[in-house]
Amino acid sequence: MKILLNLCLQKTNFSFYNYSNPKPETRNLQIMDTTDKKLLALLQQDTKKTTKELSVKLNLSVTAVYERIKKLEREGIIDKYVALLNRTKIDKSFVVFCHIKLIQHTKEFLTTFEHQVVKLEEVLECFHVSGDYDYILKICVKDMEAYREFMVTKLTTLQHIGSTHSTFMIGEVKNTTAFTL
């Protein structure tokens, strides 16, 4: 029986994955095949493509594409679908990277700052980092005057900020949301 099972496995190219002890960072990569990766590349370029259009590009049935997308959503590989806006068209073309240093590194200060900063609509991204500063914020506003207003009335009113250092974008060299798989 064991020999027959091994022959069947070799003929069909099945491979088994040990789900009892997966490494979290590699588990999702192992459940994706080449077609999944191609599908994700296409979706990262344009999520408005229909399953029919995707099926033609991938040489799959519409149902197969639909099922693959649902699987990738269930697995959390596809996190969400969004519309990417043109900053210039919505008067948010002034981009600032603001480095924040807190007065202390206690859990209370970090947590308080994080709870407060996520409420600021001008802050698009916030990263807790190592090095000379504790956080880097990506802020998009209309212009320098709007940034000054933001700094004076919102950012510097947050608790536990020791210092800030702002860097302004001169030009955009690369800006992508697409991962290479």
Where are the language model's segments positioned?
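A compositional/biophysical signature of low hydrophobicity enriched in polar/charged and small residues
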Residues: 2-181
